[in-house]
């Protein structure tokens, strides 16, 4: 975490943790080396490009300066010859009207490769500089580096009058790396500092993820832009593809592809994470993993992002059969398919999307890759079109024809309810579905893309008064949907009389068994806000949009706390409206009750005495009645105190009385 800068009369008088320096004696010394940095400098006085003026940042003269011709991804530093552990840095801005602001959010990096592909941050300047004065900051990084540099924030032309490094020679240790905040720091270092510029071209890079003072991930990769409308924002979203599969942080999947969601229009920076938590409380079989992170690209601080699963067929993600080109007949041809009802499908390459036969619903084939073979393409197109035909027929279970035979209605309802509770205008603009091999049923999920949900869309704001308690959001003229998809949803939710009880059952079970309430979700929101607090401050220094309308923002709240409170207030109203619309029943539960008076076995769970175990060694979780996690794993629990517990497995939930 960063420390505030300090003004110093004499930077030599300070104490290193664990080592006391006598008065007037430095425990680490001011370092010298060969000045390095961006070659093309700029002379403001003569309005011209000048070469190799890096030395001006180290000449001890606050009246000279280093500046670059290029506006972004420019830097200046030292080649120290050998690795040094840096203990302190000093800086002073160029004497200019914008000088003090141009050093703010500047990142100090260390590296041991001349190309800086292994660069990591060792300090971040979080305050404006002072013209004519040196400011100093203590560095908390145990690793030694040969190359050190200052990288200015974007569009600042690396304007700096003086730069100083203090430290001592040594390789250092790998147990004390610096992070920008308490969140993980993701460092993307591309070859030749190339910036990703579109969705088609992958830029080779190295990705380093720092968490809790250690390197979590350090691997070769490529990076490109991702997304559709989100790509139009100045804060760009990216996709990372590692050369080899990686385990990242606490994500359940080992995979090559990962996304960095920019959350530009979401001033809480948490809406996607909140929606994913709601999906988990609805017990959806796969909810994308996500984690808030700070991102640095080629030394430039880019803001707070969400590192997230690439939604794809992969163990630990959408765990269905991955098809091969030779899977063109018999049972092999039946799956697995991962598709997206997609309003943007028309922009995809030919052969990777289709429109359904009867109502022209646009569908993109996400897996198999490139739309698959002709046989695979034809199979899933025809299968989806048959489902569509059955949904729009009037024979719901009559004459032996029922769309429910090939469509998982429960998964569709769970997906719909996440969209309704979150107030997601775009629920049916983009809707994922999948079909596995040997399974006749198409399932709905996973959920995705909630940056304009939770009262963040001027087309529907305020949902409480404009949608109310007598209809669903997706039914209204305000909601957006891919062609034909809103009618598809209406047929299932409104025309099929069985769905009303299904919705009531699924909603009530989630409310009663899975801590789905305004109170408990707002506690989760508060926890996210606390976790994000340091990072959001830096993010909105980098992107000063808090008092601007961006994307679909309906109102300007003015500060982070009020943005968060608006989400919490919305949840209270939305639960009230949906409880009335759905007919919430507090007596409906899916939890089976068993006691430990004698050994009991239900759904693979064995209760013996005051211990709980899984017969098959499967993962299960034990919660107290207050919702606190007591145990998670596949082994036998320790002896539990007498009381009531909720045990959750992939097969369901149960109440255990010990």
Regions found by a protein language model. Name each.
Residues 28-81, 94-101, 127, 169-173:
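Disordered, acidic Ser/Thr/Pro-rich linker "stalks" and the adjacent N-terminal cap
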Residues 70-74, 97-169:
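Trp- and acidic/polar-enriched beta-sheet ligand-binding modules for extracellular glycan
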Residues 72-73, 81-90, 144-145, 255:
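Extended extracellular/luminal ectodomain segments enriched in beta-structured repeat modules
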Residues 84-97, 150:
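A short beta-strand element within beta-rich, extracytoplasmic domains
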Residues 205-262:
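Conserved oxyanion/phosphate-binding beta-strand-loop segments in alpha/beta enzyme cores
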